[in-house]
Amino acid sequence: MIQIFNPSRLTRQPFFGELIRYLDQHDDVILREIKAQFPDVAVDKLMEEYIKAGLILRENKRYYLNLPMLESLDSLELDQEIFVSEASSVYQALLEQRFETELHNQTNAAILIEQTDFARTKMTLSNYFCKVKHQYPLTEKQQELYDILGDVNSEYALKYMTTFLLKFLKKDQLMQKRRDIFVDSLVVLGYIVQNEDGKYELAVDFDKERLTFYLA
């Protein structure tokens, strides 16, 4: 099966996903067969869009896949749109590939450095912002964070999260008397933990000179 990562407006359409899987399993497909397979879809219009985008090839009234399939990880960049076959040798390597992301903000000099997989399924703040922005499906854990934060402005959230985290410059434990969604979010993300006394402790590495927090 062909998997699409970081789909565009065209490639995230449900019909496109079904179409490429159909063409991947059938040879020398004609338009009539596609219309019969997808009777409730505006096939003519969408097929022209896919052909114009270079994703589908039409030759002698036959339709074929023309996807730029991933064959190597050498030039792979995070958030790049890719097409990859689950049966290919590069697929497993892709799942194991790791990337580093950095989050900065305009309020202070704090930096959040996080590790992620290519699909951004790992529970990090960067992944959350990315998926909400592009309306990608959330993992169960990311949905838990969404239930707290919702579609929050990233700069606004970072302002309050980093301001709280920087308090660990002077103290090892912090009290938060009132319920705070940003503090709750830091707990869900794994940046802080609440001890038996109800105080919060830092749960990640913190370079105090560089004001950098590392979420492994």
Q: Where would I find each of the regions flagged by the language model?
A:
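N-terminal interaction modules that seed assembly of large macromolecular complexes
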Residues: 28-81
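Short amphipathic alpha-helical interface segments
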Residues: 11-33, 86-176
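Minor-groove-contacting beta-hairpin "wing" of winged helix-turn-helix DNA-binding domains
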Residues: 62-68, 198-205
